[in-house]
Structure formats: structure tokens, C-alpha cells
Amino acid sequence: MGFLLIGITVSAIAFSQNDSTIRYFPWQTTHYFKLGSTIIQLKQFEYGTNKNIVMINLHDDEITAVDAANKVLQNTGGILIKIENKNQRLVAFRLNKRQYKFDPNRIFSRSGIIATLKKNKSYSILAVKQIQAFASFVIKKIPADTKTLIAVHNNDEERLSISSYQKSGNYEKDVKKLNIQLSEDPDNFYFTTDKNIFYILSSLRYNVVLQENEKARNDGSLSVYYGRRNMSYVNVEVNRGQLERQSEMIKVLIRNQNKF
């Protein structure tokens, strides 16, 4: 188990020919982590010198989310951290001639790691320890002074929506407060650990879920990790393919960041 770091410079600032709008191009750094005999890449894109906006993407099949984050950061500056995984949701690795698979948004607690390994029929104590080290590796790449971590995710039709958090929904016990706008697509919503963010976004008439930080199931998700530590986190969850909508919802967060 181990890692090394390689930095690749691809940084620049450009101005539009039609106006004075600044466009940032990222400085890309690739961090490598050896999980069993498999090398996992964690990429970090830094747009300009703005460290106040930090985003993360854990599922490499959620391409719209990454495209939306990059599109916004070109204008605002900031940081995007993402797992590179050949456009696959589950991370696979080999350990002692056996293959393991896990959901990278279920690795931030021991119970979450065990559950995701068993779900994918690939559990062992040694694999749990390896993934715990990888989770720590990911957390350490998030700047320690990040005020609010912005996660970007995509869902598919009928897989996850704001309705999943209503009474009788799959995740109703994880919810402290819920704001549903009937005029909004139920697949598009914010999910946050921060009550201030919840109230601000609710007042702007978006679908918003406030996590029950103390009682939410410790499923290994990054939201629960942040919630248990009273840290500010917000996920921008949008239906796959809705690039403009996800970009707009990210921009809303950034425009209101000074109110959080």
C-alpha cells in the first residue's frame, strides 16, 4: 500500500475576444495510490488561485457532473478533485490474486466499507484495511481550510430523487428537513449537512434535503462523514445529461457562498 505524486502544469488565464471575461485553464495534479496491486488515480484540477471553491466527484461514470464543475470553474476559479476510474462507478482492485469492488462514496466509515464490499461479493478484512487507507488518502487531498465542500453527482431516472427522502422513501430516516418544489424536476436537488445552506436554497425555491447529521445511517458516504464532524457539505444532485441545469445550480451555490 502506498502512493506517489506527479504534478503536470497545464495552467493559464485567457480573455474572451468579445469581452473582458476571464477564462481559467487548470493546473492538473495526479495523485497515485496503490490499492492492492492496482494503481488508483486521484486528479486535482486547480483553476487560477481561488481556493475558496472546492468541488469533489467520486463516481467516474457521472460525466455530466464533472463537465458542469469544469464549466463553472473556468469562470470562477477554484479546485476540482475527482477519482479517475475509466468512467466506471465502482472501483475494482486486485489483492492477493482476488478482485474486489467497492462504491467510492461508501468508504468513509468502516461499516460503510464492509457493507459495500459484501454487496459486491468481495469482502475480506485485509481489503477493508486497504480501503480505509485509500479513504484517508482522499480526505487528505481536500484542503483543510475548505469552508464548504461541494460534491457533484448525477442520478438516473427513477434511481434517486427528492422523493427518496420523503416519508416511506428509502432514505427518510436520514433527513432532518425537506423542501420540495413541485415546479422543479424531482431528480434535481441539493443535499446538505448545513442548515444555513438549507434555508438559503429553500428560500430560492430549490429542492433541498437537510441531513440528520447525528442520526443518519453511517453508510460510509462523504455526507455522513462531514455531518458527523459538523462540517459544511453540499451535494449538487442532477439527472444525467442536464449539463446546463447542473451548471446553473452550482453557480447558485457560489453566488450565495458569502451567506453560508
Model-assigned labels for residue ranges:
Residues Q17-F260:
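Structured catalytic-domain cores with a bias toward divalent-metal coordination
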Residues M1-N18:
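Bacterial Sec-dependent N-terminal signal peptides
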